[in-house]
A protein has these predicted regions:
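Short alpha-helical catalytic segment bearing the HExxH-like zincin motif
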Residues: 1
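Cytoplasmic/organellar membrane-interface segments at the starts of transmembrane helices
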Residues: 37-39, 92-157
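Interfacial and helix-entry/exit segments of alpha-helical transmembrane bundles
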Residues: 7-88, 109-128
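Alpha-helical transmembrane segments and their membrane-interface exit regions
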Residues: 6-11, 147-151
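Divalent metal-coordination and catalytic microenvironments
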Residues: 4, 30, 59, 96, ...
Length: 157
């Protein structure tokens, strides 16, 4: 849930940056942003990769554990869950392509460079996406006692 929260905050922050700068909610009216602001494009991609649960990002560990647990219970549910993850990834990558690499070419200064506070917030989120994907045991070890006690309660009932 922590990883989901990090990714959701990152995506909402990115959406706010896009809408406040471009004054539109329509992805078809965006495009070509990567040409003007490569740092934003890279940070957006890192958050997106965490959201689609690519290995070595924060979303992967939770998705993997979830699907593994579901597979032991009902394999068809895990297959369905895996398909929804794939469809979500397709949607996210198509959105990124339209927004960052689309055919519209922005005028100089239309998507102004990121401010220091925006770089700090988005950079921190991107750092956490990678850190928690490369080193997930940090959170897993912290949560282990609570998980064990919860499993004992569930198995006792």
């Amino acid at each position: 849930m922590l990883s989901h929260g990090i990714n959701a905050v990152g995506l909402f922050f990115i959406a706010d940056m896009l809408m406040s700068r471009l004054k539109t909610h329509n992805m078809n009216e965006m495009g070509g942003i990567a040409n003007n602001n490569s740092l934003f494009a890279v940070l957006f991609m890192i958050v997106l990769l965490g959201t689609v649960a690519l290995p070595l990002t924060n979303g992967f560990v939770g998705e993997f554990l979830l699907l593994t647990g579901i597979y032991q219970f009902k394999s068809w549910m895990a297959i369905f869950g895996g398909l929804t993850i794939i469809l979500g990834a397709v949607y996210m990558f198509r959105s990124y392509q339209a927004i960052m690499l689309g055919s519209r070419h922005l005028n100089e200064g239309e998507f102004h460079p990121m401010t220091l506070s925006e770089k700090t917030v988005l950079g921190t989120i991107a750092f956490l996406v990678i850190l928690l994907g490369v080193y997930p045991s940090f959170l897993m070890n912290a949560a282990a006692p609570s998980i064990k006690s919860l499993l004992m309660i569930i198995n006792a009932g």
